[in-house]
Swiss-Prot record:
GO biological-process terms attached to the record: lipoprotein localization to outer membrane; protein transport
Oligomeric form and interacting partners: Monomer.
Record gene name: lolB
Name of the protein in question: Outer-membrane lipoprotein LolB
Lipid attachment residues per UniProt (N-palmitoyl cysteine): 17
Lipid moiety-binding residues (S-diacylglycerol cysteine): 17
Membrane topology label: Lipid-anchor
Coiled-coil stretches: none
Recorded GO CC terms: cell outer membrane
Length: 203
């Protein structure tokens, strides 16, 4: 009995150590490593669906987004496949083709998109936010070190909030597949069907 009690005490200590929660420092390191993956992810594309909802209107569209460094190409189409807006942004300028085939050029992508289509999309900050990278924002993580929500500003200093509902692993990187973006009475829902993580020649 005298031998049994010390052994039992030793086993209880081992069990307690095994069940000890992950130290905050380790979780911080895990998030830092994941965010570095997202920072390094500069060439990618996605396709999915987007719903833009206001008290007056609701638009349901397909979205195709190709990103190469700081340049991007976004195409919004109807469910029947007709182009609503085609946006190409480079370091020099933004070129937009509307649903009538007319071509426009400008410097501020977000402002030009809104003026031509009425669609308010914070594309400059969304380049990072859509990957789950909260650059320039206040954010919260879940127990898996995935972004749950963020609050930040676009390049017009307007406040936006984002909530992330679903993640899937794509080539060993955890990426969002559903998110909601809100600004006052504007709600934008993304349902991402596919991510492609490779360089594409789009410019």
């Amino acid at each position: 009995m005298k031998t049994f009690l010390p052994c039992l005490f030793f086993l209880l200590i081992l069990v307690g150590c095994a069940q000890r929660p992950t130290p905050p420092a380790t979780k911080t390191a895990d998030w830092a490593a994941h965010q570095q993956q997202l920072n390094d992810l500069t060439d990618w594309s996605l396709r999915g669906k987007i719903a833009i909802i206001t008290p007056e209107n609701r638009h349901s569209l397909n979205i195709y987004w190709q990103q190469s460094g700081d340049n991007f190409h976004i195409t919004l189409t109807s469910f029947l496949g007709s182009t609503i807006l085609d946006v190409k942004k480079t370091a020099l300028s933004t070129r937009i083709i509307d649903d009538q085939g007319k071509i426009y050029f400008g410097k501020n992508t977000q402002t030009l998109m809104t003026r031509l289509s009425g669609i308010e999309l914070p594309v400059e900050v969304l380049q990072q936010w859509i990957k789950g990278n909260p650059i320039g924002a206040v954010y919260q993580l879940n127990e898996n070190n995935q972004l749950v929500s963020l609050t930040g500003q676009d390049n017009k200093n307007e406040n936006w909030s984002a909530n992330y509902q679903d993640y899937k692993t794509v080539q060993e990187i955890s990426l969002p597949h559903q998110l909601k973006l809100t600004r006052q009475d504007l709600l934008i829902k993304f349902a991402i069907q596919k991510w492609l993580l490779e360089k594409t020649e789009i410019f």
